[in-house]
Amino acid sequence: METRLSIKLFALSALALSAIAAPVLAQPTPSMVKKFDAWGLYSYKGDGGTTCYVLTTPTQMQPADVDHGDNFFLVAPKPSGSGFYPQAIMGYDLKGGSQMTVTVDGRTFALEPKGNSGWTKQESADAALVAAMKSGSSMTLEAVSQRGTQTSYTFSLSGVSAALTQAGRCG
C-alpha cells in the first residue's frame, strides 16, 4: 500500500513538473548570427517570425569586490519596424525608485529600473540613445542594486553600428 502511494506521488510529481517545464522548454532559443567586434547579433524564431537583437557584455565592472552576476546591454528593433529600443539587463534586482544612467561620450540618458532591467523613461529617448551609441566609442551604465550597492559598468561601442544595421535587416 505504501509503495503504491509512493509510486502514485512520484508519477503525479513528474506529471506536474512536466506541465510546468513544458512552456519554459517551448521558448525559442536565441543563436548568435554574427560577431561585430564587441557586439553580437542574435536571432530566434517565434510565432511572429524571426526576431533579431544585438547584445554586449561589460568590459569593466565596479566595485570589483562584488558579485555582479551576468550583465548585458541589448538593443532590439521595435516591433513597429521603426527604430530600436535599448535595454539594460542586470544579474541582480535593481532598487525600486532608483535611477539608472547611461553615459555615452559625455551625454547622459536616464533609464527606469524594473526588476533586473532598465529602459529609457520616454520612448522618444530611444532614438537619441541609439544614435549616441552609434557615434560613440564607450558607454558607462550606473545602477543601484536592491541591496543599495552602487554599481558601474563600462561597455565598448565598437561594432554596434554594423550590428544594428544587420539587425534592422533581420526577419
What spans do the regions from the language model cover?
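A generic "folded-domain core" signal
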Residues: 25-171
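Short, intrinsically disordered, low-complexity terminal/loop segments
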Residues: 1-2, 171
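N-terminal signal peptide c-region/cleavage motif recognized by signal peptidases
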Residues: 21-23
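Bacterial N-terminal signal peptides that target proteins for export
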Residues: 2-13
